[in-house]
Design a protein with these regions (language model features):
Chain B
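Short helix-initiation/N-cap motifs at beta->coil->alpha
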Residues: 76-88, 101, 172-189
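Short, polar/charged alpha-helical segment
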Residues: 31, 42-74, 110-111, 305
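A local structural motif
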Residues: 31-33, 66-79, 94-96, 165-178, ...
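Pocket-lining segment of extracytoplasmic ligand-binding domains
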Residues: 176-177, 182-272
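A bilobed periplasmic-binding-protein/Venus flytrap-type ligand-binding module shared by bacterial periplasmic
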Residues: 38-40, 127-137, 223-239
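A ligand-binding cleft/hinge motif common to bilobed small-molecule-binding domains
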Residues: 99-111, 161, 190-211, 302, ...
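Secondary-structure end/capping motifs
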Residues: 42-44, 237-320
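Conserved C-terminal helix/tail region of periplasmic/extracytoplasmic solute-binding proteins
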Residues: 311-358
Length: 482, 358
């Protein structure tokens, strides 16, 4: 624009000069006119050159039309590639979905080959099935999806879902396995989930799910701390998923903004379920009821008493009590109650958990009367963690590569279970079936979702028999998740 | 077989000891590594951040250069979880130094974290309240009853409280939710929140949001940033603290020079925040004022005011004694060694230059 003005002025000036000389044109000779024309031509040439030079002198940091076209072409190519890949190479779902899973691969060695399968209930293969002392095993393979069916951006009252399957070995002597439904539920958050740490939580879960009893029983498979699960909750059926509706929530959370630490003063859960475990209809006309309350000490994150939690749980169950022959139901509202108390302390690097379990189960005698078996168990776990794996800040630290903090966690577990402390009943002798498992182990978290667990178990029966001998067991297990 | 198990047990114990050994290796006269917590991360969780002379020091590797000859490793931990994550890491002995906004540092100190403030690491700067592009709001008043997003626990929480107080409003007049910076930008773009305190530039470039409020000259809305050292580390390695301070004050000098403004923007753009955005946020500011490391009257007054506000807004339960928290000796020594006394303008408690210049 600036040089256009200059040209206009220059040409106008030259024309005015020409016009001025034109007033005396009569007097001018042809020679003079030619001279004036030559001057005019020179002026035009000079102006042309000036314009040319000004065009070349466009500052380098100003984008040209070509530059803009180039960027646009790149952008269009990028958009095309994105939409093409989206269409051809991306798995799609209708709703927000996260695929997740966990797998365990295990090796174990026992020093007794003649024990009965009494401990098979805790997921540990019986030692004597083929007179073996060692085996490789895949105890867990779990695959699932989770996400939300409705996302409430304003208040965070989301409707979430989870669906997962686990494989189970068949016990019919074949090499086959089944893929069984594990979790199948939807969960509605009644209270806001985005109101900040100080907001209370409340959700309702409907469907098949783990039950909120104690500590270990409600932890998903991939988060359980030891290779073998605790004996008492395993034999009292507390690891079973149940079908029903359960409400979970907390009130009066204590918040330490220093570390965004949230410690709800009271956590609670209550619900009603079939009581007939997973993938089955109810087998009687009574529902089972459960509840849990836990209190966490309201202290700052920096306090030594942080994450100190005390909880108590109950499960009021009703079961069909069959006669000794198993041919008739004597009572379809038999007792199958469970009570628990737990203590949790986790102040890295130290950690401790303790759980007490009591089970009261109706059992038929040979004369078709019914007696109560009172089972009792204690599980104490102490651990110490070397490394940074369990700090939220370190886990989420900004990084370019697949770096993840490593942790090594030696632990000791004392695990006692007595199936019956009351008078003897068929299958439930008084006290003599009790045993203790002591485990010395180490968990090595060497990648973000992978750990190697090694455990040395010593199993000690209160009363040894020909098929129940004390034994030692060495286990090694990789567990990975994705 | 029992013998076999015994030998397995011995092997297990030996393996555990072997695995644990490198993690628990003890420090000697000098630390094997110096760990610095930065309460921020780049776009998408990149371990690169702009904004401060300290983070420029990270991008330029000034501490790595300083400690190369001693074989001391410098570990920078950049936390997307911002200030609260730095506090969590410090509580668990995972960082020795920290770069913090005012609120997380104050809250941390009030809950018993033992550290010493050794220099100021940035101050002032623009403040934006951003709303969706189609918002009809003309003022904060128009947003009453609607959702405002901030990252609670970070300095933004105090900034919002100060802003609301300025307009005679209260947090309870709105629904204030907690989202990190990236979540709040997404929510603004989808129109699911009414406003957020965030940088407007990338959102405006996409046409999805606009500025409702822009404040560029408030001396107390953005309180000074703080660089601190853990008391235990300071007691053990005072000579290392001095070297870290001196290297970073030298960096603050580099960052404050007008001739380095453009290069610094380019370095900061490695964080994923575009070069042009840095220009828009910084071009009209005096680099010396924004990068001043001084623990002057303005720094002290702003932090003391932050303590009072944090208490008023019920973000802390215990008081913080600011005077005993500040340890200026490392900064003073560095300024003397580097002959930088008087380089940065001292500000009075109101944020005005003591030399009278504007």
């Amino acid at each position: 624009m600036k040089h256009n003005n200059t040209i206009t002025k220059a040409v106008a000036g030259a024309l005015l000069a020409l016009a001025a000389t034109g007033t005396s044109a009569y007097a001018a000779t042809n020679e003079e006119l030619e001279k004036q024309l030559a001057v005019l031509q020179q002026t035009v040439e000079a102006l042309k050159q000036q314009v040319q030079s000004q065009k070349v002198a466009v500052p380098e940091n100003v984008a040209t039309q070509d530059d803009v076209e180039g960027v646009r072409a790149d952008l269009e190519n990028f958009k095309y590639d994105e939409s093409r890949q989206q269409e051809r190479n991306t798995a799609k779902t209708f709703r927000d979905t996260t695929l997740f899973g966990a797998v365990q691969t295990r090796a174990q060695l026992q020093d007794h080959q003649d024990n009965a399968a009494t401990l098979a209930g805790n997921g540990n293969p019986a030692s004597n099935a083929s007179n073996r002392s060692s085996t490789f095993d895949v105890p867990l393979a779990l695959l699932g999806v989770r996400g939300n069916l409705y996302k409430d951006y304003v208040e965070g009252k989301n409707l979430d879902y989870q669906l997962s399957f686990t494989y189970g070995k068949r016990s019919d002597g074949t090499n086959n396995s089944d893929f069984n439904l594990a979790d199948a539920f939807l969960r509605y958050n009644v209270l806001s989930t985005n109101g900040g740490l100080e907001a209370s939580k409340l959700n309702v879960t409907f469907g098949q799910q783990l039950i909120p009893f104690g500590l270990e029983a409600q932890a998903p498979e991939e988060l359980r701390p030891t290779i073998n699960v605790a004996n008492a909750p395993a034999f009292l059926g507390l690891f079973n998923r149940q079908v029903g509706v359960i409400v979970r929530g907390d009130v009066n959370p204590f918040v330490d903004y220093a570390a965004n630490y949230r410690a709800p003063l009271v956590e609670y859960a209550f619900g009603v379920v079939n009581g007939n475990a997973q993938n089955k209809l109810d087998n009687n006309n009574s529902k089972d009821y459960l509840g849990r309350v836990a209190l966490t000490l309201p202290v700052n994150y920096a306090s030594w008493l942080r994450e100190l939690k005390v909880g108590t749980s109950f499960y009021k169950g009703s079961a069909n009590v069959k006669n000794a022959a198993g041919t008739a139901v004597l009572n379809n509202d038999g007792k199958s109650d469970r009570y628990g108390f737990d203590l949790y302390y986790n102040h890295a690097p130290y950690g401790a958990t303790y759980e007490y379990f009591q089970g009261r189960t109706d059992v038929a005698r040979a004369n078709n009367t019914i007696g109560e078996a009172k089972g009792e168990g204690h599980t104490l776990t102490l651990f110490y963690t070397f490394g940074d794996q369990f700090f939220n800040s370190i886990k989420s630290v900004a990084k370019f590569d697949d770096w993840h903090p490593q942790s090594i966690q030696p632990f000791y577990r004392y695990d006692y279970y007595n199936p019956n402390k009351n008078a003897a009943l068929p299958g439930f002798p008084k006290d003599t079936n009790a045993w203790t498992t002591q485990t010395l182990g180490v968990n090595w978290f060497f990648a973000q979702t992978t750990k190697l667990q090694i455990g040395l178990n010593h199993v000690n029966y209160d009363t040894e028999t020909a098929t129940k001998n004390d034994y030692n067991e060495l286990q090694a297990q990789f567990q990975y998740g994705f | 077989m029992k013998k076999t198990l015994l030998s397995w047990f011995v092997a297990l114990s030996a393996a555990t000891t072997f695995l644990i050994q490198p993690i628990t290796a003890l420090a000697e006269d000098s630390p094997k590594e110096i760990r610095i917590g930065i309460s921020s991360a780049g776009v998408g969780g990149k371990p690169k951040v702009g904004y401060s002379s300290v983070t420029t020091g990270h991008l330029r590797g000034v501490l790595e250069e300083e400690f190369k000859k001693d074989g001391i490793k410098v570990v920078w931990r950049l936390f997307p979880g911002a200030g609260p994550a730095t506090n969590e890491a410090f509580s668990n002995g995972q960082v020795d130094f920290g770069w913090h906004g005012d609120l997380p540092a104050i809250v941390g100190r009030s809950t018993g974290l033992r550290h010493k403030v050794i220099f100021s690491a940035g101050r002032f700067g623009p403040f934006y309240v951003v709303v969706p592009a189609d918002s009809k709001a003309k003022s904060l008043e128009d947003l009453k009853g609607q959702t405002i997003s901030i990252f609670k626990g970070t300095a933004l929480q105090l900034q919002l409280s100060r802003l609301l107080k300025r307009y005679n409003l209260k947090e309870s007049d709105f629904r204030v939710i907690s989202q990190d910076q990236f979540q709040s930008r997404t929510s603004l773009a989808t129109g699911d929140i009414a406003a957020a305190i965030t940088s407007p530039w990338t959102l405006e470039a996409r046409g999805v949001a606009k500025r409702l409020i822009e404040i560029r000259d408030d001396k107390f809305l953005n309180a000074p940033l703080t660089f601190w050292v853990g008391e235990e580390f300071e007691k053990k390695y005072p000579h290392i603290v001095q070297r870290v301070t001196t290297a970073l004050i030298k960096q603050a000098h580099w960052s404050s020079l007008e001739e380095n403004r453009n290069e610094q923007y380019k370095l900061w753009a490695q964080s994923g925040v575009p070069y042009l955005d840095w220009k828009k946020d910084w071009d009209d500011y005096d680099l010396k004022e924004r990068h001043s490391p001084l623990l002057d009257d303005h720094y002290v007054a702003a932090i003391k005011q932050g303590v009072v506000e944090a208490k008023e807004f019920k973000l802390i339960r215990k008081d913080v004694d600011v005077d005993s928290w500040i340890e200026p000796k490392y900064l003073n020594t560095a300024l003397k060694e580097l002959k930088l006394e008087g380089f940065w303008p001292e500000l009075d408690a109101q944020g005005n230059r003591k030399d009278g210049k504007k």
